Each structure stands twice: as C-alpha cells, then as structure tokens.
Amino acid sequence: SEQTGAHAIFMKGHNHTDKIADAEAELEVARAIADNGINVTLTPEGDKYTMYATNVKINKDGSKKYKFAEGLMATYTYEQKTPTEINSSAESSVRLAINHANDKHAQIALIYDKHSLFHTKDIENGMKLYQSRHKAWKTKGVKAVVVISSKKILYEHHFDE
C-alpha cells in the first residue's frame, strides 16, 4: 500500500472462486486491509498445498478432506464473507459468517460490507446471537469479527466475555 507500506501478497495457488464478483471482492478486501496498515497474504488452496489447510476432516474410508481459510491477516487466519443482501436478519448474517469462519478454523470472521448493509449494532447483536447459540464459543477458533466497509475502512469487533 502506498498509504501505509503494508502489503497484500497473492500466493501462487490461491483459488479464487468461480464467481468473478467474489474474486474481485477478495482482492478488494486484501488491498483494503493493506491500506489500513496490516500485511495480508492470500494463501494457496488445494491438494498440493495441504500445509496451508486450517482444518482436516478424516472420512470413514480414511481419505482426508482439507479446508482452507482465505489467507493470513498479519499472523491470523481469516475467512471472508461478502453479503449482497440480508436474507433473514443482519444479526443472522453475522452469525452465519462466524459459523463459516469456524468451519474453516479461521481466527477472524471477515465481513466485506461492500453494499453498506450493516450497522455497528448489527455486528454486535450478531456476535451476541452467535454466543447465545454456541455455549462453547470461547473454545472455537474465531476470536474477532473484522468488517471492511464500502469505503474500505476496517472495523474490529471482539466478543464480550
């Protein structure tokens, strides 16, 4: 980033989604994180890159299924969601983003609010909703929710004890 000196690295082997809009959102978020002074690395995914896997499931037949987070933010893994609309409620959308990040054993649930759908209260209430439905939330991987606004401003939210 010319603004902060932080960098966004795109490692060879990083699989962008088949949806062009989602791939563009991943790149926009990586640049926005760097513009906010945090180094970010989009890590590779797939069978050749299992060392970057954040979760491994062993199937009944002994085969392994690897899951990969989006990348590293500083030294934390994150998984990104870019909602284009709110289906049931903003709070539920936040809870689902946290579940998605936990499924991949990421430490940060990152929400790219490209379409200005969320307010601070939505994020806080979504985190509380997640905590109320998952009693063992402290032992899960996600430690924070980071929101990148449509203006590329980074907001960090932590769980209440």
Predicted regions and their residues:
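Metal-dependent nuclease catalytic core centered on acidic motifs
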Residues: 1-52, 57-62, 83-161
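Conserved catalytic cores of phosphodiester-cleaving nucleases, focusing on short active-site segments
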Residues: 71-84
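Terminal amphipathic helices with adjacent charged low-complexity linkers/tails
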Residues: 65-66
